[in-house]
A protein has these predicted regions:
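Sec-type signal peptide cleavage vicinity
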Residues: 2-4, 8, 22-266, 275-276, ...
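Sec-dependent N-terminal signal peptides
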Residues: 7-15
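Exposed boundary/loop context
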Residues: 14-15, 67, 231-232, 246, ...
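A composition-driven surface/loop motif
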Residues: 81-82, 120-124, 190-192, 224-227, ...
Length: 536
């Protein structure tokens, strides 16, 4: 279990009060220094945390009981979590193991006391905590959690109260990425010592190599590394190593911040000679449309990441999709983007895989479907899924027939089914075509779950026979619909009576469980408790 996590505060330490179990006059007559083994345990009376000043510190601050993130004063610090195992050693005897619990250290099941073995003065007492739970810590792969080594050292006379001051034995490296496509970076690595081992009371780093960093947040990566090493190179997205303009020398218990600029290749759409601009699998590109309407199409292959920057595409003259996603891909919105659909083609279609759309409220994507019987607007083909994390997105499928604003659309064969639709944020306005849902399935189409966890969503069912605002089209089906988030606002409407606002369209065959969680606002009603059931 990862026990130590980080918070932003000031550099500090952890103090543990240690007390002998027996008074000195109970032990010997004063002439014998060595004590019987395993007779006189060291006990922990209490734990406190004190602070000390330092430049760019990394420490702890009261009254935290866990290593958690905090933004206080823009500084980093750490604190214990219940269950942390702390080793304590007196001299060279076998270390004891204690468990942190509610601001104190206890000897839990499976633990062992540290024992006094001598009545000597100035005995060395060491204590340490590692994220691995043993005396060898692997620093090479921190993608699933940060590595920690926290140590304390002092001297004390037998049977005296002892205060242990803990500090980080490792250095923290924090990489902050900048640039238009910095959010496309999935992984960052640096070079350093890949292991840290306790030997004869000293922690040593060894085995120089790659250290994979932990993604703390979008565009932010961290790793805790052995000090005394100069970081000279970094790489992103498993690419080649890039040299830093200035090497970073690592010091223990310090935060070392590195700003890394990320650039990508830009394609100016007007310079492309062909009708189709293809983004190959695995590529990261910026497609700059310059704000001018162009007679172009875009094909994006599997695992590609593309920024759409002021792209405006006219409706193709043939029955094709204007933007086509052929596998799992990411779209990052920038500026104003307007995509028009062909007579029998969608403005944007996901053929297979999962499309993820990111953007801010200032980044707009407008998709307009044309008068079509075999297309939708933001279309999802058989098994394809969609995740929207942000952006201002308009999916106007009101001119189409048999296609939803966002979701499945009729393709000329029975029951095409999308995989799932997830909306985590953004401003979304989706209008379904004839017989189709605003968000969900088109006419005679099916699909999986619809999950909304955030954002401001407006969904309008289509006309003719009618579709739900969110849910199914006529003779269609969908999975469960779950809407949550205290700041989530949903407006779901229909143009045909008899259709659910959230649930079934005209003669809808099946809709899974509709759940509106407490805190969500739907059609101007803020739910104070969970609601289960379709919204008519």
């Amino acid at each position: 279990m990862n026990r130590l996590r980080l918070i932003k505060t000031a550099y500090t330490a952890l103090a543990a009060l240690m007390l002998a179990a027996c008074a000195s006059d109970e032990l010997t007559d004063g002439t014998v220094q060595d004590l019987p083994e395993g007779m006189y345990p060291l006990q922990i009376a209490g734990v406190s945390i004190t602070a000390e000043s330092n430049a760019e510190p990394w420490g702890a601050d009261p009254p935290q009981t866990r290593m958690v993130e905090n933004t206080t004063d823009g500084k980093y610090s750490s604190a214990w979590e219940n269950g942390d195992k702390i080793k304590v050693q007196i001299g060279d005897v076998t270390p004891g193991t204690y468990t942190y619990q509610s601001s104190g250290l206890t000897v839990a099941d499976g633990d062992a006391y540290a024992y006094w073995a001598s009545k000597d003065n100035n005995q060395t007492i060491r204590a340490w905590y590692t994220s691995s739970g043993n005396e060898t810590v692997d620093l090479s792969d921190q993608t699933k959690g940060l590595a920690y080594v926290v140590t304390a050292r002092t001297t004390a006379n037998f049977n005296t109260e002892v205060s242990l001051t803990f500090s980080h034995a490792l250095a923290k490296v924090r990489v902050e990425l900048t640039g238009e496509i910095a959010s496309f970076v999935d992984n960052v690595s640096i070079k350093g010592y890949t292991t840290c081992t306790l030997s004869q009371g000293t922690w040593n780093g060894a085995n120089e190599g790659e250290i994979k960093m932990y993604k703390v947040a979008d565009k932010v990566f961290e790793a805790n590394v052995y000090p005394g090493y100069q970081i000279k190179e970094v790489k992103v997205n498993n690419g080649t190593w890039s040299k830093l303009t200035t090497a970073v020398f690592l010091e223990a218990a310090k935060i070392h911040k590195m700003g890394i600029g990320v650039t990508g290749k830009t394609i100016t759409l007007s310079d492309q000679t062909g009708e189709v601009c293809t983004v190959e699998s695995g590529k990261c590109l910026i497609i700059d449309g310059g704000g001018n309407e162009l007679n172009k199409r875009i094909a994006i292959q599997d695992n590609a990441k593309v920024m759409l920057k002021n792209v405006k595409l006219a409706a193709p003259t043939t029955e094709v999709n204007t933007i086509e996603i052929n596998g799992s891909a990411t779209l990052l919105l920038s500026g104003t983007n307007e995509i028009n659909g062909a007579t029998q083609g969608c403005p944007l279609t996901v053929i297979r895989g999962t499309l993820t759309i990111n953007g801010t409220d200032n980044d707009k994507l407008t998709l307009t479907g044309e008068n079509s019987y075999n297309a939708g607007c933001l279309g999802l083909r058989e098994g394809a899924s969609l995740i929207i994390n942000g952006g201002d997105i308009v999916a106007d499928g009101s001119k189409t027939q048999h296609g939803s604003g966002i979701g499945a659309y009729w393709t000329g064969w029975n029951d095409p089914r999308y995989g799932s639709i997830t909306i985590n944020g953004g401003k979304i306005n989706a209008s379904g075509g004839g017989n189709s849902a605003g968000i969900g399935s088109g006419s005679q189409c099916g699909g999986g779950d619809i999950i909304i966890t955030g954002g401001n969503i407006t969904a309008t069912g289509g006309g003719n026979l009618g579709g739900a605002g969110i849910g199914t089209g006529d003779y269609g089906n969908c999975g469960d619909i779950t809407i949550s988030g205290t700041n989530t606002v949903v407006t779901a409407t229909v143009v045909k009576e008899g259709c659910d606002k959230i649930g079934l369209g005209y003669n809808g065959r099946y809709c899974g469980t509709v759940t509106i969680k407490a805190g969500v606002t739907v059609n101007n009603t803020k739910y104070t408790s969970d609601h289960v059931g379709r919204i008519e």
